[in-house]
Regions:
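Active-site neighborhood of phospho(di)ester-bond hydrolases with catalytic His/Asp-centered motifs
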Residues: 1, 19-24, 52-55, 77-80, ...
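Divalent-metal (often Zn2+) His-rich catalytic cores of metallo-beta-lactamase-fold enzymes
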Residues: 70-71, 76, 85, 99-194
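Active-site HxH/HxHxD metal-binding segment of metal-dependent hydrolases
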Residues: 1-50, 66, 73-75
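A contiguous, basic/glycine-rich beta-loop/short-helix subdomain that forms a polymer-engagement track
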Residues: 193-202
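Divalent metal-coordination and catalytic microenvironments
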Residues: 11, 53-56, 63, 81, ...
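Rhodanese-like catalytic fold shared by cysteine-dependent sulfurtransferases
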Residues: 90, 145-181, 185-187, 192, ...
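Active-site metal-binding loops of divalent metal-dependent hydrolases
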Residues: 24-25, 57, 76, 82, ...
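Active-site flanking residues adjacent to catalytic metal/cofactor-binding acidic residues
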Residues: 80, 86, 124, 218, ...
Length: 403
């Protein structure tokens, strides 16, 4: 697994359970045994049967849950990264074998389809995961629903499926390599040993001032709260965006502190970071003082602009203005903004040198959320004239329909 640290070792150490993985891993998994197609495990009234489902990786497996008290009927299947709700697994982790892996995934999906329409599907990821771009916001589904609605099942042939997969554009965050190695060797600490603590008063003072800040300050409050008032130089990564995009902006040697609404929010965010291997978390702040001067207001506030204003700027563009779209490539291909420059959000750290700090940038995405993340990063890098297209593509489409 490459997007977070597995809890398998910690769970095994606490319970004495054995750990198993598929037979064809790229490297030996030091803490686990191998399980192959057809292997069965008896747990109480349940039988768990391994189904080899290569494609996402060579050792991918699914696990069929059979209820022995219901005449040995299969009830559900844990599909890992093979089948999601409204999406199927990535096949790009082997660049030299992408066609082969896509073909294997097609075969694996047919194996799952043959289990029966009533089988409940429990995937490993949900909406917002880097492991697929079209996942629906539901925690489970059924084989029958996916056969009817999942784009991966709508391909008319194996050839068509392979062609579809080869056209996909996925992103591999820099931290993936550390996650892969951590999960090969095994880590016993997928969660922080204690809850995130509020910073002491003297430490708060240092973190509040951008010139004295000893690391990266991440604001995990809502986008609206960040735009209204934030600490200059902080990075806005609330909710699932922290795990989805934090790995593009953070390194493992730099301390991190959080700005949060509550102890619970700070703790949940620190747990996300810990699962990604970021363990230098100093603590959190809760209060963001309101600016007391016009100059401070401009440093702590991000303007939001609406679709009609963006339309006005597009129709009568100024030489120093640019609409900057930070969505994924496939989103841009499906619906483009007129006259926009495209830089994927995760690529901003390596590509922001292409941007001119003297220009005025309006950040856009699908809804305004990722645009706010991008704005926070550019402001932290010294860009001064930045605002956010509120609603972004959703608002743009509604505006055009109304117009």
């Amino acid at each position: 697994n490459e997007d977070f640290i597995s809890g398998a070792v910690a769970l095994a150490n606490q319970t004495g359970a054995d750990i198993y993985h598929g037979k064809y891993a790229d490297e030996p998994i030091e803490y686990a045994r191998k399980a192959g197609n057809g292997d069965k495990f008896e747990i109480g009234k349940w039988t768990l049967e391994v189904i080899a489902t290569p494609g996402h990786t060579k050792d991918s497996i699914c696990v069929l849950a059979i209820d022995n008290e219901q005449d040995g009927q299969p009830i559900g299947v844990f599909t890992g990264d093979t089948l999601f709700v409204s999406e199927v697994g990535r096949t790009d982790f082997y660049p030299e074998e992408m066609e082969k892996m896509a073909g294997q995934l097609y075969d694996s999906l047919q194996t799952l389809a043959n289990l029966g329409d009533d089988i409940i599907v429990y995937p490993a990821h949900g909406a917002g995961s880097v492991c697929g771009s079209g996942m629906a916001e539901r925690e489970f589904t059924t084989i029958g629903i996916e056969k009817r609605q999942n784009p991966g099942y709508q391909c008319t042939s194996k050839k068509a499926f392979i062609e579809r997969k080869l056209k996909e554009n996925h992103y591999i965050a820099p931290y993936f390599s550390k996650m892969e190695q951590s999960n090969v060797t095994g880590m016993d600490t997928p969660l922080p040993p204690v809850a995130c603590q509020k910073l002491a008063q003297d430490a708060q003072s240092a973190w509040q001032k951008s010139a004295e800040r000893p690391g990266v300050l991440i604001d995990v409050r809502s986008h609206a709260q960040f735009r209204d008032c934030h600490y200059p130089g902080s990075l806005n990564l609330p909710g699932g965006l922290l795990s989805a995009y934090g790995g593009w902006f953070l390194d493992y040697s730099t301390p991190i502190a959080l700005v949060a609404d509550s102890h619970q929010q700070a703790t949940e965010s620190s747990e996300q970071l810990w699962r990604m291997g970021y363990q230098q978390i100093s603590g959190y702040l809760t209060m963001v003082p309101k600016p007391d001067t016009i100059e401070a207001y401009h440093r702590q506030h991000v303007n939001a602009v609406t679709a009609d204003k963006v339309d006005e700027r597009i129709r009568a563009p100024r030489a120093n203005w640019q609409l900057l779209d930070v969505r994924k490539q496939e989103e841009v291909e499906n619906n483009e903004f007129d006259q926009a420059k495209h830089i994927y959000l995760g690529y901003l750290p390596e590509m922001c040198h292409q941007l001119d700090k003297s220009r005025h940038y309006t950040l856009a995405c699908g809804s305004g959320k990722r645009a706010t993340v991008a704005a926070s990063y550019l402001l932290a890098q010294g860009f001064e004239n930045v605002d956010v297209f509120i609603g972004s593509m959703q608002a743009w489409q509604s505006y055009q329909q109304g117009a």
